[in-house]
Amino acid sequence: MNKRAQSRSAARLAAVQALYQHEMEATPVAQLIHEFHQHRIGAIIEDAEYADADVPFFDDIVKGVLARADEIDAAITARLASGWTMERLDRTMKAILRAGTYELIARGDVPVGAVVSEYVDVAKAFFDGREAGFANGLLDAIGKDVRKK
């Protein structure tokens, strides 16, 4: 994986963490982004080194998800199984799906397959079970919905 791809992968992971924090604590966007810039991205915390991330890409994902939350949640909800709601999803999974859906909607420069693959990898960082497959199927379906030609 080249350096640009690695820094974008790190940005995606950090964005999911930031979105999770926002969901849990309602941290204001400017404060949230500042905290990640200053204390997370590229930092060493409890002997774990956070990779250098593509900071503008991180910012775009976090700000974009929060600015377009209703549109993103509608796209996700449209592909959930009958009887499922956003509220039923694990908060980490919500953050993963929201970030991935934002990229599918707003980042036409990133191929659908790359978005899906990257967020499946993020899901694998947080979950051991079927969740990665769930993220794969949902993001693939959303990609087909939003990138129709």
Curated annotation (Swiss-Prot):
One of its GO terms (molecular function) is RNA binding. The keyword Transcription regulation applies. The keyword 4Fe-4S does not apply. One of its GO terms (biological process) is transcription antitermination. GO terms for cellular component: cytosol. Keywords: RNA-binding, Transcription, Transcription antitermination, Transcription regulation. It comes from the Bacteria. SUPFAM superfamilies: NusB-like. InterPro entries: NusB-like_sf, NusB_fam, NusB_RsmB_TIM44. NCBIfam families: nusB (TIGR01951). Involved in transcription antitermination. Required for transcription of ribosomal RNA (rRNA) genes. Binds specifically to the boxA antiterminator sequence of the ribosomal RNA (rrn) operons. Belongs to the NusB family. This is Transcription antitermination protein NusB. The lineage of its organism: Bacteria, Pseudomonadati, Pseudomonadota, Alphaproteobacteria, Sphingomonadales.
